[in-house]
Amino acid sequence: MHTGGEPLRIVTDGFPKPDGKTILQKRRFVKEKLDNFRKLLMHEPRGHYDMYGALLVEPDIEDADIAVLFMDNRSYSTMCGHAVIALGRYATDYGYVRPTEPETKVNIECPCGLVKALVEYKNGKSGSVRFQSVPAFVFATDVELNVQGHGKVKVDISYGGAFYAFISADKLGLDLWKTPINQIKDAATMVTNAVKNEVQLEHPDDNDLAFIYGTIVTDGKDEYSDEPTANICVFADAQVDRSPTGSGVTARTALQYHKRHISLNKSRVFVNARIGSKFSAKPVRQTKCGSYDAVIIEVSGHAFYTGKSAFTFEEDDPLKGGFLLK
């Protein structure tokens, strides 16, 4: 499937069953013991540098209809909004839930927590999906970093199921629409590396959630407007999201709410600056995450089917483990 151009390879069979009582334990087990399967599915020659995957596992939350581990070119994310949108349709269409009109509810257990998706359903066909995030919050604003090639810059850090750094393109001397994408990718990666080196992240629920997943370069238009606001997300190992980034839009909306640029139940459109794909998002209610003031964000988008595949490897294949070209 794809959501806004960002691929999602849903793994339904053939992957060894991960040990663990909780989804974070299963994530840790797959990361430590079964990572060769991620590389086989995500990397060339079966995948590519920017491939993204979702492994369906047994839920450990009673209310969950499905549970998922996310995977990318480097490791395993704790949340992925574009994947949740796709999985909402998939669960509705493949019998994980009973379809109901006008919307079908799908509870998806993610490593960051339970995410509730609502899938449009009419005349036997699923459509667009909206989901409500886990509590999203701002970790810090105006964090000064020493960024290789750019000197001292300030970023905001916000959580939307995963942690992201936010910076406007002009602060890096970039044009979000015209600068070659590799230059944006390199600059964003340097920002992410600086956060890793200089900022100690924390999450109230679990230390496994306390890592920087990527940097989102924006157009700087955070004041509320009916006009779309653009961004590009660079995550994992310099992977470029083709969609506006579901968890990133969640974190960015939480940041805008924190700065009083947007109010509850006001919807904003977010667009990928290069692909043109769009998500909409709105803060729907206040909450807490530990001691942090948090907000639940509702994100909407549409996913589409792209095909079915069965992957194999031969033992004598010298490249059976996969590879990446940088």
Swiss-Prot record:
Q: What is its EC number?
A: 4.2.1.77
**Key words, A-Z:** Lyase
- Which residue windows are coiled coil? none
Residues the entry annotates as binding substrate: G81, H82, D241, G246, S247
Active site residues according to the UniProt entry: C80 (proton acceptor)
Source domain of life is Eukaryota
Q: Which reaction does it catalyse?
A: trans-3-hydroxy-L-proline = 1-pyrroline-2-carboxylate + H2O
Quote the InterPro entries the UniProt record gives: Pro_racemase_fam
Reply yes or no: does the keyword Cytoplasm apply: no
An example of a GO molecular function for this protein is: hydro-lyase activity
Other comment = In contrast to the T.cruzi proline racemase enzyme, lacks the conserved Cys at position 245 which is replaced by a Thr residue, transforming the racemase activity into dehydratase activity.
Entries under PANTHER family matching the protein: TRANS-3-HYDROXY-L-PROLINE DEHYDRATASE (PTHR33442:SF1)
What protein family is recorded? Belongs to the proline racemase family.
What is the recorded function of this protein according to its Swiss-Prot or TrEMBL entry? Catalyzes the dehydration of trans-3-hydroxy-L-proline to delta-1-pyrroline-2-carboxylate (Pyr2C).
How does this chain assemble? Homodimer.
Its name, as the record gives it, is Trans-L-3-hydroxyproline dehydratase
Q: Which gene encodes it?
A: l3hypdh
